[in-house]
Amino acid sequence: MAKNRRDRNSWGGFSEKTYEWSSEEEEPVKKAGPVQVLIVKDDHSFELDETALNRILLSEAVRDKEVVAVSVAGAFRKGKSFLMDFMLRYMYNQESVDWVGDYNEPLTGFSWRGGSERETTGIQIWSEIFLINKPDGKKVAVLLMDTQGTFDSQSTLRDSATVFALSTMISSIQVYNLSQNVQEDDLQHLQLFTEYGRLAMEETFLKPFQSLIFLVRDWSFPYEFSYGADGGAKFLEKRLKVSGNQHEELQNVRKHIHSCFTNISCFLLPHPGLKVATNPNFDGKLKEIDDEFIKNLKILIPWLLSPESLDIKEINGNKITCRGLVEYFKAYIKIYQGEELPHPKSMLQATAEANNLAAVATAKDTYNKKMEEICGGDKPFLAPNDLQTKHLQLKEESVKLFRGVKKMGGEEFSRRYLQQLESEIDELYIQYIKHNDSKNIFHAARTPATLFVVIFITYVIAGVTGFIGLDIIASLCNMIMGLTLITLCTWAYIRYSGEYRELGAVIDQVAAALWDQGSTNEALYKLYSAAATHRHLYHQAFPTPKSESTEQSEKKKM
């Protein structure tokens, strides 16, 4: 059930409001205001308020309308919420020429204040979705979204990256709010955050994000580039230009930004004045703001939000409705709640890791080269004790080399990389032991020698037991001798042809058990284990005839 009522809005004008009553609860919809939909918890995990999100985006009036999502993101305490409230004034008073309101009226809407501490946390959206007619007659839903500032004293880099990336993924117009200039670190942070967002999205040949607007606040060089969009376009063209004389790192940052966004633009906005910056009781009254700022603000907001400027949200080329945006919101937050994505790292941490990994690689390479000189491919067999002595000596030298390299991060940070180096060197040593053993002629002849001994022993036992009348034992020994002879021939064929290498490894394992242990029980146990592990190889080498397998299955049934 719907009722119309004429109300005074927050900006002094009258507007027709339609209040909806559900069939269950005859209560009017609450007054519009900011609603936090993404909550950053104390343990730096993220929670989506699905109830609030559904209530706003799935209302009957907007859920099937194509959506335009406008977001403002950037460093904390740079006036993002202050700007969002002027956007609200425009959206509520679009038809009025003097939409900025009365000069004595305080600025309300999204929570904001002066000072050095953060105000907004997580992501907030305005609870009222604005229905706007575009020039082609299509009615779209406009969603305004305010975000937590990056790099405040209570947020990790992952917090900042997640909030920025998520707002960029959800929005169709992302305003990157910057102070005074576009510096190289601003571009590098943008590269990091957008890449963090792109990782969470499905791969596509299209650019993953839509419109990016660099909003440079407190611009102090209008004599170089004038205030507004034209000056901003010339300024941004110079800042994002890729030239051959640039360092590769600088080129990659600019190429990455161009590859992520369909449209990139810039607006240069003057400083709002000293009263705004220094007055602790400033409440947003226009009379305290410089005229130059207000003049350009009146250009900026319509430039962003006029019907012809609105970009409908698209994902993979498909236009998204409010209903669809809810599903994408849920899907994206699940990715950031999990551990699938790598955690972004600070420049110090990333540099320290690279520094330590480079030291590990250098030390390991030194060990490798010296071990190759001692027992490499063309070197003769080395006694195992001598090889172990050399290994321990070179390992100590490699560890000393690692410790001698100047590394970032400190001793505690480097300790796990030292453990990694020692572990990798031990693994290399095992490979060198195997390689060295393969050069030992006695080691190479171990398997055939063992099999010959088994054949000889079973031959003698068969002869003796046959002579004294123990025919059963003699027959058993003859059978073992025959199987061993077949095994020897099979092993020789494998060595010659290179086929059935896994079966050859089984034969070597059994021979090694007989050679090293000298225990029949141990040998039989290894034979059983090897046979169980490589059963498929036995069937491949000695296939059972079809008729025989059928008879066996019938006997089992009997």
From Swiss-Prot:
Reactions performed catalytically: GTP + H2O = GDP + phosphate + H(+)
Start and end residues of each stretch annotated as Autoinhibitory domain: 521-558
Broad class of the protein's primary localization: endoplasmic reticulum
Modified residue annotations for Phosphoserine: S10, S22, S23
Domain of life: Eukaryota
Residues annotated as binding GDP: R77, K78, G79, K80, S81, F82, Q148, R217, D218, V276, N279
Stretches assigned to the Lumenal side: 471
Record-linked CDD domains: GBP (cd01851)
Effect of Y196C: In a patient with hereditary spastic paraplegia; uncertain significance; no effect on homodimerization and GTPase activity
Coiled-coil features, chain-numbered ranges: 412-439
Effect on the protein of changing H258R: In SPG3; increased GTPase-dependent fusogenic activity
Keywords: Acetylation, Cell projection, Coiled coil, Disease variant, Endoplasmic reticulum, Golgi apparatus, GTP-binding, Hereditary spastic paraplegia, Hydrolase, Magnesium, Membrane, Neurodegeneration, Neuropathy, Nucleotide-binding, Phosphoprotein, Transmembrane, Transmembrane helix
Positions that bind Mg(2+): S81
Disease cited in the entry: Spastic paraplegia 3, autosomal dominant: A form of spastic paraplegia, a neurodegenerative disorder characterized by a slow, gradual, progressive weakness and spasticity of the lower limbs. Rate of progression and the severity of symptoms are quite variable. Initial symptoms may include difficulty with balance, weakness and stiffness in the legs, muscle spasms, and dragging the toes when walking. In some forms of the disorder, bladder symptoms (such as incontinence) may appear, or the weakness and stiffness may spread to other parts of the body. Neuropathy, hereditary sensory, 1D: A disease characterized by adult-onset distal axonal sensory neuropathy leading to mutilating ulcerations as well as hyporeflexia. Some patients may show features suggesting upper neuron involvement.
Protein name per UniProt: Atlastin-1
Organism: Homo sapiens (Human)
Name of encoding gene: ATL1
